[in-house]
Amino acid sequence: MLLRRLSIQWKITLLAGLCLLGVVSLLSGLSVYRTQHSTSLVKQSSTEMLNEAAQARLQSRGEVQAMRIQRYIMDAYQYGKGFSRQVLFLRDQAQKRFLDAYDLREDLTRQVKTALEGNPELLGLYVAFEPDALDGKDKLFAGQGELGSNDAGRFSIYWSQATPGHLESEAMAESLLQDTSPGPSGSAYNAWFTCPKTTGQPCVLDPYFDDVGNKKMLMTSIAFPLELDGKVIGVMGLDISMEKLQEIAVEGSQELYEGQGRVSIVSAAGLLAGHSADASKLSKKLQEVYPNQGTDLLQAIAANHEQVFHQDDQLRVVEPLQPIPGSKPWGVLLEVPQNVLLGPAIELQNELDNQSVQGTVSQLGFGLVAILIGLFAMWLTARGVTRPILNV
């Protein structure tokens, strides 16, 4: 009814306008769709690229941390390996020159002290022989601690320095050498003595707390077998502080995304030797600190293979390391929140979204202007066409 009341001019204008509106809307819609589709592809590919780059960066940081830890432990290992050879050399020379047993024990006690003084980073240094394996005269020196001899006369000297330069010594009693009570890792307390004796190979122990002087300190021990003709006749070992590893963990976390990451150092048995987030967790089992993923993380370390885990909005990278040759692997665990790690990707997505919205608004605006201009042009054209008819 309304159309019948319209003039020919407005009917032509309306029909042409509808056609123009349909064409412009179709072209604008197609343009908006293609723009959004292209933006989506760019967002996806850019996010994947930035995610891979961030993950690669985190893995490279893990390798750097692993190298720092390995270098620290290997320095102590090389020092201990050299000194263990020196101990065997002193024993050999004493036998060849028929050195008095008193002088040999006194000399060994002094050499252990001197070796510890020469390396202030060490907490302790010890030498313990099997019964009568040093000179065959243990009974003559029973209870002579000043000569490194314990209650049974066995040579078992331990020098310690809770503070560099302040040395204390003790002859380790038979009860201490035979203490098999389990520690936090499940190994016997005297693993520092029995491990190299049983395996015939150097051993690095899991972290444990022990008293050095009057201080309880977290440490680990590297123990070496003293072998003669293929038989282990004693053990030489050194204690190193885990404070340095904790420092490495804290420094490493500060370097991760401006301190927003976390670094942990894990022993072969899954005990924390370093934990930047909370020092009170040191010596705790990995499964206690990470109840949801601790077992998987420990399995990755045991497999000696770098792995990446995504859980609880966290990206975790496990980087294994071998503290000393032939030992079971330890590991470095790096953690970064996903939103921090993907910060650049999220910023790029937001920027692309903003540009997409602006582009869509601009296209729709230009389309609307084109429609209005087209309608006005159609109106003028219709007016020119219908004027002669109206004048008849």
Language model: regions and residue ranges:
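Juxtamembrane extracytoplasmic/periplasmic/luminal helical "stalk" adjacent to the first N-terminal
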Residues: 9-14, 19-111, 117-123
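Conserved beta-strands of PAS-like sensory domains
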Residues: 215-252, 315-321, 327-341
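Non-catalytic regulatory/interaction regions at protein termini and inter-domain linkers
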Residues: 1-10
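Membrane-proximal, non-catalytic sensory/regulatory domains of signal-transducing membrane proteins
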Residues: 193, 197-225, 257-262, 290-331
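Solvent-exposed, extracytoplasmic
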Residues: 107-115, 235, 239-281
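Cytoplasm-proximal transmembrane signaling helix
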Residues: 13-21, 25, 259, 339-392
